[in-house]
Amino acid sequence: MFLLTPVLVAVVCILVIWVFKNADRSLEEKKEEARAQPWVDEDLKDNTEHLQVEEDTEEWQESEESVEHILFSHTRYPEQEMRMRSQEFYELLSKRRSIRFISSEPVPMEVIDNVIKAAGTAPSGAHTEPWTFVVVKDPDMKHKIREIIEEEEEINYMKRMGKRWVTDLKKLRTNWIKEYLDTAPVLILIFKQVHGFAVNGKKKVHYYNEISVSIACGILLAALQNAGLVTVTTTPLNCGPRLRVLLGRPSHEKLLVLLPVGYPSRGATVPDLKRKTLDQIMVTV
């Protein structure tokens, strides 16, 4: 019968202790990694990377494939004018800031129509245009939206977001109180459509729907700045389903961004932040 010598026993004990210590360290690292992960709004998860199985949509496919191609009309500017226009556009957008103090002064509805039409020119996967812009002007509806968002945002700040995220936001002096949702004359809620419907009523895949809608949001921000209006990009975490029901939107639409829109209130302030320089954001190969 094999007998363990004292030396062998010591070696076995050391190995056992080493295994347990490494297991504990690995567990702690996983816990720390989980704590460091930013909280994700489950309602916004985009499953298009899994290539949704599309139902039989032959009628839709045939009609799309037969779209006529026309000659592209392009205006080419002299180089000097190109430089001037690009510089002027940059200077315009460089003044864009996130404004949390918004006046209740009404804005022309025609301007809102135009900026949303501009956002609707965004490119999209397979030209599916997977966006819905909900414009809210009614004071009672705006207040209901505020109540839902503030209720969830308080939980986000206290529990879901984590200490690091909350600390990073302190320089912006922001919290779960969103007075601008009442004072702004217009709220624009941008929904992504996770799928659409073909002419035969079957589901139609909306490829890269979140990326497409995000591009549209960027164009909308630029259009608002060009029109002389201000906003703050609001992402109402965990509020999507309730706001979708409140606004009567279908289940295949998911809330991506909310923009309160108007003029800045008198005495509005912004944090004195600096943007990264060109050499910090661009790499030329």
UniProtKB/Swiss-Prot annotation:
GO CC aspect terms: cytoplasmic vesicle membrane; plasma membrane
Record-level Gene Ontology MF annotations: FMN binding; iodotyrosine deiodinase activity; oxidoreductase activity
Major site of localization recorded for this protein: membrane
Catalyses which reaction(s): 2 iodide + L-tyrosine + 2 NADP(+) = 3,5-diiodo-L-tyrosine + 2 NADPH + H(+); iodide + L-tyrosine + NADP(+) = 3-iodo-L-tyrosine + NADPH; 3-iodo-L-tyrosine + iodide + NADP(+) = 3,5-diiodo-L-tyrosine + NADPH + H(+); L-tyrosine + chloride + NADP(+) = 3-chloro-L-tyrosine + NADPH
UniProt-annotated location(s): Cell membrane; Cytoplasmic vesicle membrane
Binding annotation for FMN: R96, R97, S98, I99, R100, S124, G125, T233, T234, T235, R275
Enzyme class, UniProt record, top EC level: oxidoreductase
Enzyme Commission number(s) of this protein: 1.21.1.1
Positions with a binding annotation for 3-iodo-L-tyrosine: A126, E153, Y157, K178
InterPro entries (UniProt xref): Nitroreductase, Nitroreductase-like, Nitroreductase/BluB
SUPFAM superfamilies for this protein: FMN-dependent nitroreductase-like
Record's keyword annotation contains Transmembrane: yes
Cofactor(s) in the UniProt record: FMN
Keywords: Cell membrane, Cytoplasmic vesicle, Flavoprotein, FMN, Membrane, NADP, Oxidoreductase, Transmembrane, Transmembrane helix
Membrane topology term: Single-pass membrane protein
GO biological process: thyroid hormone metabolic process; tyrosine metabolic process
The UniProt record lists the keyword Cell membrane: yes
Function: Catalyzes the dehalogenation of halotyrosines such as 3-bromo-L-tyrosine, 3-chloro-L-tyrosine, 3-iodo-L-tyrosine and 3,5-diiodo-L-tyrosine. During thyroid hormone biosynthesis, facilitates iodide salvage by catalysing the oxidative NADPH-dependent deiodination of the halogenated by-products of thyroid hormone production, monoiodotyrosine (L-MIT) and diiodotyrosine (L-DIT). The scavanged iodide can then reenter the hormone-producing pathways. Acts more efficiently on 3-iodo-L-tyrosine than 3,5-diiodo-L-tyrosine.
Similarity annotation: Belongs to the nitroreductase family.
Known partners and oligomeric status: Homodimer.
Protein name as it appears in the record: Iodotyrosine deiodinase 1
Organism: Rattus norvegicus (Rat)
Lineage of origin: Eukaryota, Metazoa, Chordata, Craniata, Vertebrata
